[in-house]
Amino acid sequence: MKKLLALAVIAPLLISCSSSTKKGETYNEAWVKDTNGFDILMGQFANNIENLWGYKEVLIAGPKDYVKYTDQFQTRSHINFDDGTITVETIAGTEPTAHLRRAIIKTLLMGDDPTSVDLYSDVDDIKISKEPFLYGQVVDNTGQPIRWEGRATTFADYLLKTRLKSRSNGLRIIYSVTINLVPNHLDKRAHKYIGMVRQASRKYGVDESLILAIMQTESSFNPYAVSHADALGLMQVVQHSAGKDVFRSQGKSGIPSRNFLFDPASNIDTGTAYLAMLNNVYLSGIENPTSRRYAVITAYNGGAGSVLRVFSNDKIQAANMINRMSPGDVYQILTTRHPSAESRRYLYKVNSAQRAYRRR
């Protein structure tokens, strides 16, 4: 059965991968059309922002950056999940503090459902939640977490009195307030998904520490994560490459929807299934489990085909070459000779993060 599965899926897998380039080397006409359309949308979106905010002030949502515009693109909330900061800004010419106040409150109290928020419009579709996404990740000036509107409102007023800043972009005055997340904000977010990670780990036989390391590196546990290549969610799965491959292996037709991949449990399941496919099918010819893990990590970012081509254009010969090397040599080659600088850095980042999770 395993061999039959391998035969069924190995061809598309050899030229398709998950989250970097992003990620797939297969020519797929529908995917190209969708990608071109997405590129056009992003270009128009960025142009609208540049016209209002100025060239150096363009901010767009990314894997580790939540950016939401409102008020006809005059106000925006930016959560930088790497730096651990929330910055709310406005260029509104009238009552700027009122615009900031409203945006601060909504950002502090927003839920964790990415399907309910359009990050590529100025529609104010942010819903106040009884279980805010940022609860526990940010505290007010008294050191208390923020769950209710009353506390969020009081904190917003405090911020506007004590932390309001302004600068000029050459066109307009930008008013802003910055809030720091708590020092362990990354762990706070990761904790939300531990149960889902454990379930996927047991289902597909993938180490929990690897799943968590991939999530941290891909999105910093940001469920709203998007990318310039339209990779989606916590594990940055692309619908037309990794998503399609996983669906095919599970006997499903088509591709996962955006809403499906923005659901944390579905995203983690799909991303983990893809890791298992890379390990058990695509890169199964690599015998040493540590060497194979290095290859799987790099392939999740840049494609399995590109990993093997680092060693040989012939995939069987590539596996044989890897099998004659020590894991340390394989790691050294992948982090220095892979043609993609992003993939070289990716292996280092994920491997370092996985070591940290293993020590816990």
Swiss-Prot record:
The keyword Signal applies. The gene is mltC. It comes from Salmonella arizonae (strain ATCC BAA-731 / CDC346-86 / RSK2980). It is found in: Cell outer membrane. The keyword Transcription regulation does not apply. A lipid is attached at residue 17 (N-palmitoyl cysteine). This is Membrane-bound lytic murein transglycosylase C. One of its GO terms (cellular component) is cell outer membrane. NCBIfam families: PRK11671.1 (NF008670). Coiled coil: none annotated. A lipid is attached at residue 17 (S-diacylglycerol cysteine).
